[in-house]
Each structure stands twice: as structure tokens, then as C-alpha cells.
Amino acid sequence: GCYLTPGLIDTHVHYSQTGWADGRPDARDVRAEFPYAQAMADNQAHPERFHRAFLHSGVTAVFDVGGYPWTRGLAAACEHDLRAPYVAAAGALLATYDPKVLMLPDQSQFVFPKDGEEARAAVRSHRAFGSAAIKVWLIETPERSLASLVPIVMAAGDEARRVGLPLIVHSTTLATAKVAVAAGAQVLVHSVEDHEVDDEFVAAMVKQGTFYCPTLTVR
């Protein structure tokens, strides 16, 4: 006989990416042959390509954890469409690092708060425009130490709680992941890569109730 099982939930997707180099010129730059602007225009015009891929894989709900502003509209567009999964989308990322090549002339998928007050303002703006979560792209650089970024992340987390949105964080080092959890992150969207996680980190996650999304990659 036949039976139905609950659909899978993919907690880390990006409708603003393609799954290939044309959507991430910061990883491999193929823009000379495959223009980034065209790839992004195609994504916006034809999200049904991804809808089909998800549904055919048994995925009936997805969490878009950061992208161009138009991704926020997918939730309403897909809610009653049987040809699409349920979508929750964070919208633009609050970023501590500027990748430059991942932006378009007329829109950006990043906001760059310089301090805690700007982070709070960005959170309020995201809430007003319908974001389902606040995504912080927490990346240390030689120009910006983790210590200098802590006030921004903490302010974003505090303001997210105030407006009733979950805080989700890209933090791939143990040090940044600990800061993210301390700021109230409900989801870490990547595994820690530089060290084995320690008891302190695990205890903090359990206390906070943080979900750990490994975001495994098949190579």
C-alpha cells in the first residue's frame, strides 16, 4: 500500500544562490562567462526551479537564511501553492564583512552595522519589512577583531528578542560560535570548523536551546 510521511525541513537554503560558482563569485569567479547579475535575475524570476527540486526531494519547508530583499516575499507567495514548499526567509544579512562581489547595483543582500545602535536599527527595519529572522554573518577579519564585533552581535540579539524574531548566526569558529550563543542565537547555521567543540560550548547551547545546523556539503 501507499502511505505519507511528514515532509523534510531544510534549515539552510539560499534562493539568492544557485548551487554553483555563478552564484558565489567570492568563492570562484566565473563572471566573465556567467554574469552574476544575470544569475541573480534568473533566480528572482524563476524560484519555481528550486521549489520543484525541494519537493521532489521530499522537502516541504525551507528556511532561507539570508539573501536579497525579494526573498522575503516568497513566504506569502508559496503559502498556498502546492507546487512550492513553505518558506521562511531572513532577508538581508547583518554582516561584519563586506564581500563586495555578492551585491547588485540596485540591491544588496547585506547590511553593515558599524555599532550596536546601527544593528538595533537594522533589526527593527527587518521586522518592519517582514523578515522571519535576523541573520548575522559573524566573520572576523584583520581589520575587525572579534572583540570589536561583540557589541554589534549582542545588540542585534537583544533587539531581535525585543521585536520577537529569532537570531540566527553564521559563525564557523568556536570563538565566534560562543559569542553567537551568548547573544541568544536560536540557530547556528554552520558547524564549527576550526576546533572540536568543548564542554563549555555544549553547555551554553543546551542552556540557550540553540539548534546546531551542520550544513553538510557533498564533494
Go through the PLM ranges and name each one:
Residues 7-13, 62-64, 87-91, 134-136, ...:
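Hydrophobic faces of well-ordered beta-strands that scaffold small-molecule active sites
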Residues 101-158:
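Active-site gating/metal-coordination segments in enzymes
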Residues 97, 137-219:
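Active-site core of metal-dependent hydrolases
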Residues 17-43, 91, 95-108, 208-219:
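Active-site gating loops and adjacent loop-to-helix segments of metal-dependent hydrolytic enzymes
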Residues 64-108, 113-118:
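Mid-domain alpha/beta scaffold segments of enzyme catalytic cores
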Residues 3-78, 182-183:
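Metal-associated gating/positioning segment near the N- to mid-region
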Residues 43-53, 110-127, 171-178:
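Short, acidic/polar
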Residues 59-61, 82-87, 130-132, 161-165, ...:
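Short, well-ordered coil/turn segments that N-cap beta-strands
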